[in-house]
Amino acid sequence: MGRIIRVTGPLVVADGMKGAKMYEVVRVGEMGLIGEIIRLEGDKAVIQVYEETAGIRPGEPVEGTGSSLSVELGPGLLTSMYDGIQRPLDVLRQLSGDFIARGLTAPALPRDKKWHFTPKVKVGDKVVGGDILGVVPETSIIEHKILVPPWVEGEIVEIAEEGDYTVEEVIVKVKKPDGTIEELKMYHRWPVRVKRPYKQKLPPEVPLITGQRTIDTFFSQAKGGTAAIPGPFGSGKTVTQHQLAKWSDAQVVVYIGCGERGNEMTDVLEEFPKLKDPKTGKPLMERTVLIANTSNMPVAAREASIYTGITIAEYFRDQGYDVALMADSTSRWAEALREISGRLEEMPGEEGYPAYLASKIAEFYERAGRVITLGSDERVGSVSVIGAVSPPGGDFSEPVVQNTLRVVKVFWALDADLARRRHFPAINWLRSYSLYVDAIQDWWHKNVDPEWRKMRDTAMALLQKEAELQEIVRIVGPDALPDREKAILIVTRMLREDYLQQDAFDEVDTYCPPKKQVTMMRVILNFYEKTMQAVDRGVPVDEIAKLPVREKIGRMKFEPDVEKVRALIDETNQQFEELFKKYGA
């Protein structure tokens, strides 16, 4: 028990804290606000408080809890909405109304709800950390696997029968090698700043299919990969992340709203229960965990929310699921680090950010990955991290963007000009890149189309050629270009408007399956080949531009039937044959 001697914003200094540990959770002041020790000097402790500190004064008590900031991992996580330190917001609302009173705590997992537990092991079985003890149907989509905590191993001496239990009831007793008995419940706690262990990291060879053509075809994300979405305000970072949370083929989605507008979290809460998962037809909310730490919540909790989210994601990964984690936005998290660092009077680095910004960002993204999990059955799980970055004024040379780009392998550069032109997703195809293309091309060739890489590279080269031609057009106008280059501009316009641009509000076009993506690309590249032949044979470019099939190609993104899209190849060939006859070519 210590006493407060100084309060500066979210930082509190207390003395008489002998025996306290780094990162220990403490209750601060008469109200019992939740805080975490972030520095120890002699018997003084510097505490960052996760709640508003107004009204706290020197002399009030500070009480240690003896444990570090941890999350509860067990059934009841999915469909929940938490704040940055895993307090369930719906329970807090019942306790204090629409505005959260200070010093409130509530268990993260519901204590009174009964879950139907089916055991998967029997008495006498040897178990190690990560083994599956049993399963609980948490939602209609996800079966929650009850795991042996990583630090436990031994022989099962008692196990509960199949039936309904709360998370507090003991379901298994394990006799450890030293003869002591460990009682296991359906949940365990894990410190958020410690990454959960695994057996082996695997190379990222499987793409995370998002149904967004720009991303899947050109700037692919791999399962277990890391991606950054930097962009200026209003360029569509949050909407792009919502699209990825809705349609990516991860089985579990953890969405962290970190320091962004509250209404954006409301959007997710209103939309996700109505939306259906394309694979199961069930509401998307049933596979989602939301962590809301909006801009009007205390700054210090922003820093914790990122760790809370990734720990929950790692827990589902350990069950053998593919998890996608969206962090929106890591810039606000970095700003929270900067504010706390400033209050600690640390030496500032570039633009006032702390000198350890780079290592903190790297530490977060390094927790992503595709792994063989702990346990005897060699499960494979993954955590893919997609972090939005909001640089002030859209300046990509800013420290948070630069340090993020050093660590992540995929860069989706959002462009305010494209967003203003209503081009969604506003990912600039000239500035973005993905370093996973080589690793995942085998998957595309085996499962979708053996010519995927060739078509992708051809289309990319055309888009780069268009950028060069646009500069000439701006200076001398389009009429000065030779026919061959005019024809390229026709095709690249089709690539931009009919392929890259997508309608997030259209039932069909909001999600484009891989087979359809490749077929659409084939249709456009077939048109390109025929166009080049026609120009070489002397057909005027204006005639090519007037072909009726162009309008159908423009509408193919709204066509759910892939065979009808494929039929456009024959139609294109036929119309070009007629052109060749007409011009005697």
Curated annotation (Swiss-Prot):
Residue ranges the record marks as coiled coil: none
SMART domains (UniProt xref): AAA
SUPFAM superfamilies tied to this protein: C-terminal domain of alpha and beta subunits of F1 ATP synthase (SSF47917), N-terminal domain of alpha and beta subunits of F1 ATP synthase (SSF50615), P-loop containing nucleoside triphosphate hydrolases (SSF52540)
GO molecular function list: ATP binding; ATP hydrolysis activity; proton-transporting ATP synthase activity, rotational mechanism; proton-transporting ATPase activity, rotational mechanism
Entry-linked Gene3D superfamilies: 2.40.30.20, 2.40.50.100, Bovine Mitochondrial F1-atpase, Atp Synthase Beta Chain, Chain D, domain 3 (1.10.1140.10), P-loop containing nucleotide triphosphate hydrolases (3.40.50.300)
InterPro entries: AAA+_ATPase, ATP-synt_VA_C, ATP-synth_a_Xtn, ATP_synth_asu-like_sf, ATP_synth_asu_arc, ATPase_a/bsu_AS, ATPase_F1/V1/A1_a/bsu_N, ATPase_F1/V1/A1_a/bsu_N_sf
Keyword Cell membrane annotated: yes
The name this protein goes by in its record: A-type ATP synthase subunit A
